[in-house]
Amino acid sequence: MAKGGREKIKLESTAGTGHFYTTSKNKRTTPEKLEFMKYDPKARKHVAYKEVKLK
């Protein structure tokens, strides 16, 4: 059976609110860390979310 190519990751807010999103990414095609501008409901504005390892 083949091992899955997708890895679960956590996108954590850089605003320091502790808010996060979970998603998955293909680790073969995107080996670099992801960074998105997403909405943080605790800060009530769009902030940068950086990838951290899901524990």
Curated annotation (Swiss-Prot):
Pfam families recorded: Ribosomal_L33
GO molecular function term, any single one: structural constituent of ribosome
Chain spans, region Disordered: 1-27
Basic and acidic residues bias (residue ranges): 1-11
Record's compositionally biased regions (Polar residues): 14-24
GO annotation, cellular component aspect: cytosolic large ribosomal subunit
GO BP of this protein: translation
Keywords per UniProt: Ribonucleoprotein, Ribosomal protein
Keyword Ribosomal protein among record annotations: yes
Alphabetized HAMAP family for the sequence: Ribosomal_bL33
Family per similarity comment: Belongs to the bacterial ribosomal protein bL33 family.
Name of the protein: Large ribosomal subunit protein bL33
Organism, scientific name: Dechloromonas aromatica (strain RCB)
